[in-house]
Amino acid sequence: MQTPHILIVEDELVTRNTLKSIFEAEGYDVFEATDGAEMHQILSEYDINLVIMDINLPGKNGLLLARELREQANVALMFLTGRDNEVDKILGLEIGADDYITKPFNPRELTIRARNLLSRTMNLGTVSEERRSVESYKFNGWELDINSRSLIGPDGEQYKLPRSEFRAMLHFCENPGKIQSRAELLKKMTGRELKPHDRTVDVTIRRIRKHFESTPDTPEIIATIHGEGYRFCGDLED
């Protein structure tokens, strides 16, 4: 497996240097950014596997940047921040963060959690996604293209899917008509176990629905099964 690339987005120099030293000592390739502009520049130039980001940043804060990150890149995301209230933590996870750690942090715990996250996200589905006999799934005029990890609309327009959305859609298409619990979907999407107040699945499904549901509040393709989870009701072509 390639050496993981970690991007640290932190405007405080001492903390940034500390994190860089910690992860370089573990053998990772480490990149640094102090704000959103630098983050996007690095993401456009390098294949980043994990972003470790503070919330309190100059310009756009980490929560806003996390929303952009989830729309634009397939990358694992960990918040490392001094904001330790439950509201920020829940919001961060709702946006799609894979982990949330508060300062001051234990370096050993941080590296273990980063390693576990990288192991899950870099290995999750790589074999199964690359060795499938089918290259795409077509339903209701739409196509899920596995090689490009994108949705193609009836008009031919292509929508590149973030990692979590692609994995959710792939799981739905492989299991049409079956009820999928939030715990199972989260495991497929991120490798994480479902915890109380984790809204990652619901937020992800809401984003997916915006692509192909004409009325997302009354969805027909991905149905909500109250108290159980979600079910893919699309008309898959043979």
Curated annotation (Swiss-Prot):
| Any one Pfam family match given in the protein's UniProt record, by short name | Trans_reg_C
Q: Which InterPro entries would you find in this protein's record?
A: CheY-like_superfamily, OmpR/PhoB-type_DNA-bd, Sig_transdc_resp-reg_C-effctor, Sig_transdc_resp-reg_receiver, WalR-like, WH-like_DNA-bd_sf
Q: What is the lineage of its organism?
A: Bacteria, Pseudomonadati, Pseudomonadota, Gammaproteobacteria, Enterobacterales
Chain's role: Member of the two-component regulatory system ArcB/ArcA. Represses a wide variety of aerobic enzymes under anaerobic conditions. Controls the resistance of E.coli to dyes; required for expression of the alkaline phosphatase and sex factor F genes; it may also be involved in the osmoregulation of envelope proteins. When activated by ArcB, it negatively regulates the expression of genes of aerobic function. Activates the transcription of the plfB operon by binding to its promoter.
Q: Which GO terms describe its cellular component?
A: cytosol; protein-DNA complex
Annotated DNA-binding ranges come to 134-234
Q: How is the polypeptide modified once translated?
A: Phosphorylated by ArcB.
Q: Which residues carry this modification: 4-aspartylphosphate?
A: D54
PROSITE patterns associated with the record: OMPR_PHOB, RESPONSE_REGULATORY
> Where the protein is mainly located, per its record?
cytoplasm
Top-level division of the source organism's lineage: Bacteria
Compartments annotated for it: namely: Cytoplasm
Alphabetic keyword roster = Activator, Cytoplasm, DNA-binding, Phosphoprotein, Repressor, Transcription, Transcription regulation, Two-component regulatory system
| Gene Ontology biological-process entries | negative regulation of DNA-templated transcription; phosphorelay signal transduction system; positive regulation of DNA-templated transcription; regulation of DNA-templated transcription
Q: Which residues form the Response regulatory domain?
A: 5-118
Specify the protein name.
Aerobic respiration control protein ArcA
Named from the GO MF annotations, one term is: DNA-binding transcription repressor activity
Species per Swiss-Prot/TrEMBL record: Escherichia coli (strain K12)
